[in-house]
Amino acid sequence: VTRRFVEAYTRQVYDWCQAHDLAYTGHYNAEDSLWSQIRWIGAAMPHYPYMHIPGIDKLGRQINTAAGTVLTVKQLDSVVCQWGKPRALCENYGCGGQDFAHTGRKWIGDWAYVLGVNLNNPHLSLYSMRGERKRDYPQDIFYQQPWWPENRLIADYFARLSYVLSQGQRVVDVLVIHPIGSAWTLYRPGAARDVEQL
């Protein structure tokens, strides 16, 4: 299933972007647990080699939970290291709420960077917050926020950190076998517990 998805979609988008001097980036849906990967994308890691800047999504105001686990970041980091990719992107702060300001953003961003991310992609900048837009997985990071005039403080911090962390070459001497194959053998629709215990 995963191989077919990669060949029928991810690799074709990657090849098209490559042929047109574009960088394919973004994240796949439901990459945050083994169970959700099987249900939505088969497995996250096989897609990442066919992205110029592979990425993940870190939702909410918490770390190390189902909505943003260490597993998610380390899967990305592993492929970036193995394939020599220069960047590991994380879309941060979605579903954090409109009142999620600098200290929370720094905490979440630093957590992701410690685990291997080196490109911060803040979630959502709306030109207008009319209608349903103000409720679209906030936070909106733009002029509508009362702290917008000071946003440069955190933006510059992550820009500098991203640059520094993208300049070196990491030496990784630890091998961890990823459990997605075992997860597939335990998978049963509607029964997440066995898979999530891995």
Predicted ranges, named:
Residues 1-198:
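Carbohydrate-binding surfaces of carbohydrate-active enzymes
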